[in-house]
């Protein structure tokens, strides 16, 4: 059991094990070491995750998704966690196609129980090769997902991490992320708020 009683899931939406992989694991390490959270990690790297085809099996049968792939493992992790970190590289000003597919496939969970993710707390980390590389629009799309699923999105507050953690990799992978002191400070700031809000929710839940 963690010191906080909080289980935190980090999801890397990058097909590579570079900047996003590093940033998520750095955030999880910080949450574990600073706050005593229990952590779990999932990466889309080398995973088979099919697109949602809008077949409506999940709507008709209320038995989850008809596809049997890596999402089966992730669904379980998502449901068990109290809080999530969704992280993505920026592709064309938005989250990666791989992460978008993960989010689309969550329709099957909502079809069975539309409150399944209710009151879980979520944050975003988006990594761009440029300093102004589309991180904030990408973070906004993650916030939208959280709101649609009755989750509670958090940022780091004004002056530094408004919508979440925007990180600049300079297209240098993990080394670029490590070098972005401002970006990693934002990661820590948002994790602090994530843990704080998760504790508040747990304390007030009937």
Residue ranges and their predicted role:
Residues 1-113, 159-206:
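N-terminal beta1-alpha1-beta2 submodule of the flavodoxin-like/Rossmannoid cofactor-binding fold
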């Amino acid at each position: 059991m963690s010191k906080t009683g909080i289980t935190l899931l980090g999801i890397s939406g990058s097909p590579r094990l570079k900047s996003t992989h590093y940033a998520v694991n750095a955030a999880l390490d910080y949450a574990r070491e600073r706050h005593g959270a229990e952590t779990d990690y999932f990466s889309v790297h080398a995973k088979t995750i099919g697109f949602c085809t809008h077949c409506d099996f999940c709507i008709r049968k209320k038995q989850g998704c008809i596809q049997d792939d890596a999402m089966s493992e992730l669904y379980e992790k998502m449901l068990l966690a109290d809080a999530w970190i969704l992280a993505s590289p920026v592709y064309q000003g938005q989250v990666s196609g791989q992460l978008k597919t993960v989010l689309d496939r969550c329709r099957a969970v909502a079809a069975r129980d539309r409150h399944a993710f209710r009151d879980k707390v979520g944050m975003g980390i988006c990594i761009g090769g440029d300093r102004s590389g589309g991180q904030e629009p990408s973070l906004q799309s993650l916030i939208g997902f959280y709101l649609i699923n009755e989750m509670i999105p958090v940022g780091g507050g004004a002056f530094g991490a408004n919508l979440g953690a925007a990180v600049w990799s300079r297209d240098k992978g993990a080394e670029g992320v490590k070098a972005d002191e401002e970006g990693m400070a934002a990661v820590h700031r948002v994790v602090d708020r994530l843990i704080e809000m998760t504790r508040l929710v747990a304390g007030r839940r009937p």
